[in-house]
Amino acid sequence: MQLNTLSMVHEFLRRTVKPGDFCIDATAGKGRDTALLCRLTGDAGRVLAFDIQEAAMAQTKALLAAEGLTAEVIRDSHANMERYAAAETVDCVVFNFGRLPGGDPSIFTRSDTSVAALEAALRLLKPGGVIAIALYYGGANGYGERDAVMTWLETLDDRKFSVLR
């Protein structure tokens, strides 16, 4: 297995997500995480996928259709995920912060909405639920988002949350 960020996150998800789980892909992008979550949760599960870019939504929908998978693909900011799920009902939330590979380089996740989305994800998580975060930084987005997310992670109560970096 090639070790890169995506393969490590996917291995973590394979060991964590179960059939029937309710999962959110907060940054759908090309749909790879969404498709994996759909396969892992099965017909009894539920998957929401968020993105603000039409191109990302189209790629996600095409991948799901090609694999015969179903998810609710929503064109909205990940910061608004609480509009679509109730508190303490979600088993897993996945984030890939940065930009859509091959997409418009002027569109990328931002620290203000990303931290708001992480806070929303915590409120949506069931006890024992997990959040997986992949941070891609540099380029036009610089390091501000990375720094904001890392600072936010440091504020979590370590008696309630475990953070693996």
Residue ranges of each PLM-predicted region?
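Mobile active-site "lid"/loop adjacent to the S-adenosyl-L-methionine
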Residues: 95-117
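Class I S-adenosyl-L-methionine
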Residues: 139-165
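Conserved glycine-rich SAM-binding loop
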Residues: 29-31
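Conserved SAM-binding motif I beta-strand of class I
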Residues: 46-51
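S-adenosyl-L-methionine
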Residues: 1-22, 26, 35, 39, 57-91
